[in-house]
A protein has these predicted regions:
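Structural signature of WD-repeat beta-propellers
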Residues: 47, 77, 93-94, 133-134, ...
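Short loop/turn segments that connect beta-strands within beta-propeller blades
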Residues: 56-59, 102-105, 142-146, 187-191, ...
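Extracytoplasmic beta-rich repeat domains
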Residues: 13, 18-37, 65-83, 110-125, ...
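Beta-propeller domains
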Residues: 47-68, 179-180, 207, 213-247
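Sequence/structural signature of beta-propeller modules
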Residues: 1-12
Length: 249
């Protein structure tokens, strides 16, 4: 949940063990954005049509496959992602659904429709599922049954990049980046704002650099939040106080 990967190194040379078809990939109309996740010896994937698949990590054998879209018109809709926690796979979709599946069988446990499309994967922590819509609205849902626990609304922004960043959580605080350039820290239990930060571009040399959207995932490591904006601004913020510790323009 805190996105801190630290220094990962592969032991020895890498060789292909297996490959598998996960469904439809990127095209002129849609981009495959969702990353795979691995847990309990199973690899989980989702394609551009919100088709979730589970494969045996050892040999690539398909264990199950589930189509999350309930409408053929939703095929090829951009966005979404997956996260796993406590035996459940949680998926967000570009057609505004958050879905909880049994990780072993793919059986649907619950489904919650949000106010708008979701471009990034959900984040799960302490019995709560956090998902942000393209309209910069963060939802905190119960991981048990999908009940809405609280919401937070950021500033609206018309222009944005393809995709989005999943919230980061640590020490009872969820940090969510919005396409407006805002970064907001909230208490996980009630959504109360702890602090807010802005990575709005200072120098706008072209149309792309003028976009404030934060595409990279925030990272929380040992009480410090690291954030990178679209204009290459990197800031480090104290998780508890919100004080900016340093910045690289």
């Amino acid at each position: 949940p805190n996105h801190a990967m630290h220094h990962i190194a592969a032991s020895g040379s890498l060789t292909r063990q297996w490959s598998a078809d996960i469904g439809d990939g990127s095209s002129d109309e849609a981009q495959l954005l969702a990353q795979p996740v691995i847990a309990g010896g199973i690899v989980y994937t989702v394609d551009i049509n919100a088709e979730v698949s589970a494969f045996d990590q050892k040999n690539g054998k398909r264990l199950w496959q589930v189509e999350l879209s309930k409408d053929d018109d939703n095929e090829g809709i951009l966005g979404g992602g997956i996260a796993i926690h406590d035996g459940r796979l949680f998926a967000t979709t570009g057609f505004a659904d958050v879905v909880a599946l049994d990780a072993k069988s793919g059986r649907e446990i619950w489904r919650k429709r949000l106010s708008g499309p979701i471009r990034a994967a959900p984040t799960v922590w302490a019995g709560r599922v956090f998902a942000a819509t393209v309209a910069n609205e963060l939802y905190a849902l119960s991981a048990d049954d999908g009940r809405e626990l609280w919401t937070h609304s950021g500033l609206r922004e018309v222009a944005g990049l393809v995709g989005g960043a999943a919230p980061a959580v640590d020490a009872g605080v969820v940090v969510v980046p919005y396409s407006s350039g805002e970064v907001v820290a909230l208490r996980v239990e009630n959504g109360r704002q702890v602090w807010t930060e802005s990575l709005t571009p200072i120098r706008r040399s072209d149309a792309v650099s003028a976009i404030a959207h934060i595409r990279g995932q925030p990272v929380i490591d040992r009480g410090i939040v690291y954030i990178v904006g679209n204009s290459n601004r990197t800031v480090a913020v104290d998780l508890r106080t919100g004080n900016r510790l340093w910045e690289v323009p």
